[in-house]
Curated annotation (Swiss-Prot):
Record's keyword terms, sorted: Nitrogen fixation
Top-level taxonomic group: Bacteria
Designated name of the protein: Nitrogen fixation protein NifU
Record-linked Pfam families: NifU, NifU_N
BP GO terms, sorted: iron-sulfur cluster assembly; nitrogen fixation
Length: 246
């Protein structure tokens, strides 16, 4: 499982080197938009080394994390060293991947090999992926962070409830577009002291992505409000309730 407080979470919410690279010398695309998972890697090469790397990803949180990690891995490498990067190194750079998510690292690796092959005038044929074992049947449960997130800076003067309500709504709205692109969504249910209750739907309600979503949201809220916050998932979605807000 992805570490909700570690590398994958950081790479997902704060992706490195995301966006187009106009001066790219080598471009590799792997995956398919039709199936909802694709990554494009762009490299600027100078004196036989990767001077700059950027990526575009269409798909889930793991595609974004792997693309981000790969650009960091290859920047500064000579072409031989870049070719030698493995899917396992990409997995390690994101803090590990569960078996069903390992194809994200394989796609990022394929995009790298395709880009280098095109630059060098070669043809790269991606190996057939190994079949992913079917996970054992288990009831789906929502995962909540085990502890409050501490803010980077604690506010000397607490915010008024109405101002907190506005900021909480803004933070949640800011993450919804990315979650919707990943096939899920999050909505605010209630704010009760340090507890922020939310309702997850779609892909975000499964146990793998729920931890990633809730952990990142909790940290953002704590930093924004300047006080410890705990985000708790709710099975049902009642009317929004914010204690003290008018």
């Amino acid at each position: 499982m992805l570490d909700e407080t570690g590398k994958a979470l950081d790479l997902f919410f704060n992706p490195r080197n995301a966006g187009p690279l106009e001066a790219a010398d080598a471009v590799g695309t792997a995956g398919s938009l039709e199936v909802g998972d694709a990554i494009r890697l762009m490299l600027r090469i100078e004196a036989g080394r990767v001077a700059e790397a950027r990526f575009l990803a269409f798909g889930g949180a793991h595609a974004i994390a792997c693309g981000s990690a790969l650009t960091v891995l290859v920047t500064g490498l000579d072409l031989a060293a870049a070719r030698a990067v493995t899917p396992e190194e990409i997995e390690a750079a994101v803090g590990g991947l569960p078996a069903p998510r390992r194809p994200a690292a394989a796609r990022a690796w394929s995009a790298l090999q395709i880009a280098l092959a095109a630059y060098e005038g070669r043809t790269f044929v991606a190996p057939e992926p190994a079949p992913v074992p079917a996970p054992a049947a288990a009831p789906v449960r929502l995962l909540a962070p085990k502890h409050d997130s501490q803010p980077r800076i604690v506010r000397d003067v607490p915010l008024a409830p109405a101002e907190e309500a506005r900021l909480i709504a803004e933070v949640i709205e800011s993450v919804r577009p990315r979650l919707r692109a990943d096939g899920g969504d999050v909505t605010l249910v209630a704010v009760e002291g340090s507890k922020v209750r939310v309702h997850l739907t779609g892909a975000c309600s499964g146990c793998q992505l729920a931890a990633l979503t809730l952990g990142g949201l909790q940290k953002r809220l704590a930093d924004t409000l300047g006080r410890p916050i705990r985000v708790i998932p709710e099975e049902k979605r009642p009317l929004v309730s914010i204690a003290g807000a008018r």
